[in-house]
Amino acid sequence: MSLAQLTQQPVQTVQASSTVAEAARLMCMHSVGALVITDATEVTPLGIITDRDLVWMIAEGLDPHTATVDQFVRSRLHSVCVTESLSDVTKAMREHGVRRLPIVDPEGRLLGIVALDDILLLLGKELADVAAAITGELKQEHRLGAARAETGK
């Protein structure tokens, strides 16, 4: 499976100038736990704001109606290019300690987002497919062995 196929699309975004309250409304409206923060063009990813960021902000006493999401923009956004492998994505998540990464094209334009949960679901399905194939082969071998035993060969 390619990274493009695994990527959640359309990706939910919020402009950097939006308030945290608006980001929370968007998360609720789209049933997502994170939004990619973009510039005014909504093409260039600048950062990510998560539901955990919202909890932290409230715990710190910031006003969600005046605080803007650009406060969550780090100096360097970690993203991966759509041409990279799934292995590269999991390595980047591990190295940067993140659970979600924006997926960009070679020019840096936002294409989607991939979450660790998506990867785990894919790998679980792949393992189940392998287990089913092995089980099928073992059943076939057992049937052949039983048939040989009946015929005495």
Model-derived segments and spans:
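A glycine-centered beta-loop-beta connector
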Residues: 27-30, 35-52, 93, 101-117
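Tandem CBS (Bateman) regulatory domains
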Residues: 1-9, 50-79, 85-94, 115-153
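The conserved cystathionine-beta-synthase
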Residues: 13-31, 38-39, 80-97, 104-105, ...
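Short, flexible active-site loop motifs that bind/organize anionic cofactors or intermediates
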Residues: 9-13, 44-45, 79, 109
